[in-house]
UniProtKB/Swiss-Prot annotation:
Residues 23-57 form a propeptide. Pfam families: Conotoxin (PF02950). Expressed by the venom duct. This is Delta-conotoxin-like Bt6.4.
Length: 84
């Protein structure tokens, strides 16, 4: 009985999720609300991998980084140059 209830709840949740995501606002992001803005952006990043924030490059050891936070060092430590 518990398993049946869990399956029914899961099916209802997935049906509602599909309905929310398939409302057509992907073509009009100006009317997207809430989570839809996030997911439409994620879809665009999947189509254009260069737009993804995960593809940011890091500066190697010894590269100029200026002040901490201006340039991402691969090691994560910056003091004028990227430290090992």
């Amino acid at each position: 009985m518990k398993l049946t209830c869990m399956v029914i709840v899961a099916v209802l949740f997935l049906t509602a999720w599909t309905s929310v995501m398939a409302d057509g606002s992907i073509n009009r992001p100006d009317i997207a609300e809430g989570w839809q803005k996030f997911f439409s952006k994620a879809r665009d990043e999947m189509k254009n991998r260069a737009a993804s924030e995960l593809n940011k490059r890091c500066a190697g050891i010894g590269s100029f980084c200026g002040l901490p936070g201006l340039v991402d060092c691969c090691s994560g430590r910056c003091f004028i140059v990227c430290l090992p």
